[in-house]
Amino acid sequence: MAEEVSNKQVILKNYVTGYPKESDMEIKNVTIKLKVPEGSNDVVVKNLYLSCDPYMRSRMRKIEGSYVESFAPGSPITGYGVAKVLESGDPKFQKGDLVWGMTGWEEYSIITPTQTLFKIHDKDVPLSYYTGILGMPGMTAYAGFHEVCSPKKGETVFVSAASGAVGQLVGQFAKMLGCYVVGSAGSKEKVDLLKSKFGFDEAFNYKEEQDLSAALKRYFPDGIDIYFENVGGKMLDAVLVNMKLYGRIAVCGMISQYNLEQTEGVHNLFCLITKRIRMEGFLVFDYYHLYPKYLEMVIPQIKAGKVVYVEDVAHGLESAPTALVGLFSGRNIGKQVVMVSRE
């Protein structure tokens, strides 16, 4: 007889308009049998860490034709996480394995591993890193910068939302290559972090700049070669007029637009023509084949202290709604993680 245990879950109550609130979610207690369904290749896991990511906002509304499905109101939220395998119907995973990938916002989940699920081999680093630098955000930074932007030593690089899960890594990867790097963030604390901890050459608080284009001109008098786009809206407009000829823009996210019922337009797209700019959107899913190569590069750098990563860890599943909502007001410092259990 399979063990049946209590399972705390974070439920989305209804689809969300405007900025999400803690009250859009609720904590619910159910029971779960820690048993793989007969004849399936599912994996039963105990969730250890959950990742709060900006893309999750789009899943809180009814969407069609996107790269991800909407969350189902009345059901647990899903997202990237780190978990321990309790039972497996898939020969690739064994009881006791540590994994990262898509899981439920709950204490225990039954996962179909056809979804992205990676076995964790290197445990000499904090397990929570597999929600960030060694997980989806890390691969996003690596693929977006190295594969989409084709950077060269000595180029000028601008990163928006630069202290977040992805931005802090893009800046460090650019510095490792020998680029001049500037980041923008939304508080003095974050700006200081960019320069003192992550090694950005310069950084500024976009909230204190009345003219974003003038601010960029101040830091990039000769223009920007590469822009890693996380924000959209007014920042993108300001960047376009400050790009160099043949500049590259990797479009990773547009967090300034996610909570608007009417998204803002972009006025300076003509610069794409006059400056021969290449602007490319990308999704990390298309680059997971490079994950082993990425780990080979980044794990030694982490262990040598050459790449650093800042996390903002919330404790307990009950804290997850507040942690997720905080992303959209910039409350988090670094990568937002929820620790569900230590094991």
UniProtKB/Swiss-Prot annotation:
<feature type="binding site">
    <location>
        <begin position="282"/>
        <end position="284"/>
    </location>
    <ligand>
        <name>NADP(+)</name>
    </ligand>
</feature>
<dbReference type="InterPro" id="IPR045010">
    <property type="entry name" value="MDR_fam"/>
</dbReference>
<feature type="binding site">
    <location>
        <position position="252"/>
    </location>
    <ligand>
        <name>NADP(+)</name>
    </ligand>
</feature>
<dbReference type="Pfam" id="PF16884">
    <property type="entry name" value="ADH_N_2"/>
</dbReference>
<dbReference type="Pfam" id="PF00107">
    <property type="entry name" value="ADH_zinc_N"/>
</dbReference>
<feature type="binding site">
    <location>
        <position position="55"/>
    </location>
    <ligand>
        <name>substrate</name>
    </ligand>
</feature>
<keyword id="KW-0521">NADP</keyword>
<comment type="function">
    <text>Reduces the C=C double bonds of alpha, beta unsaturated enones, but has no activity on enones with an endocyclic C=C double-bond. Shows a high specificity for NADPH as the hybrid donor. Substrates are 1-nitrocyclohexene, 2-methylpentenal, trans-cinnamaldehyde, methyl-trans-2-methylcinnamaldehyde, trans-2-nonenal and 1-octen-3-one.</text>
</comment>
<dbReference type="GO" id="GO:0035798">
    <property type="term" value="F:2-alkenal reductase (NADPH) activity"/>
</dbReference>
<feature type="binding site">
    <location>
        <position position="190"/>
    </location>
    <ligand>
        <name>NADP(+)</name>
    </ligand>
</feature>
<feature type="binding site">
    <location>
        <position position="258"/>
    </location>
    <ligand>
        <name>NADP(+)</name>
    </ligand>
</feature>
<dbReference type="InterPro" id="IPR013149">
    <property type="entry name" value="ADH-like_C"/>
</dbReference>
<feature type="binding site">
    <location>
        <begin position="165"/>
        <end position="166"/>
    </location>
    <ligand>
        <name>NADP(+)</name>
    </ligand>
</feature>
<dbReference type="GO" id="GO:0032440">
    <property type="term" value="F:2-alkenal reductase [NAD(P)+] activity"/>
</dbReference>
<comment type="subunit">
    <text>Homodimer.</text>
</comment>
<dbReference type="InterPro" id="IPR041694">
    <property type="entry name" value="ADH_N_2"/>
</dbReference>
<feature type="binding site">
    <location>
        <position position="186"/>
    </location>
    <ligand>
        <name>NADP(+)</name>
    </ligand>
</feature>
<feature type="binding site">
    <location>
        <position position="332"/>
    </location>
    <ligand>
        <name>NADP(+)</name>
    </ligand>
</feature>
<feature type="binding site">
    <location>
        <position position="230"/>
    </location>
    <ligand>
        <name>NADP(+)</name>
    </ligand>
</feature>
<keyword id="KW-0560">Oxidoreductase</keyword>
<feature type="binding site">
    <location>
        <position position="206"/>
    </location>
    <ligand>
        <name>NADP(+)</name>
    </ligand>
</feature>
<dbReference type="InterPro" id="IPR036291">
    <property type="entry name" value="NAD(P)-bd_dom_sf"/>
</dbReference>
<protein>
    <recommendedName>
        <fullName>2-alkenal reductase (NADP(+)-dependent)</fullName>
        <ecNumber>1.3.1.102</ecNumber>
    </recommendedName>
</protein>
<feature type="binding site">
    <location>
        <position position="80"/>
    </location>
    <ligand>
        <name>substrate</name>
    </ligand>
</feature>
<dbReference type="InterPro" id="IPR020843">
    <property type="entry name" value="PKS_ER"/>
</dbReference>
<dbReference type="InterPro" id="IPR011032">
    <property type="entry name" value="GroES-like_sf"/>
</dbReference>
<comment type="similarity">
    <text>Belongs to the NADP-dependent oxidoreductase L4BD family.</text>
</comment>
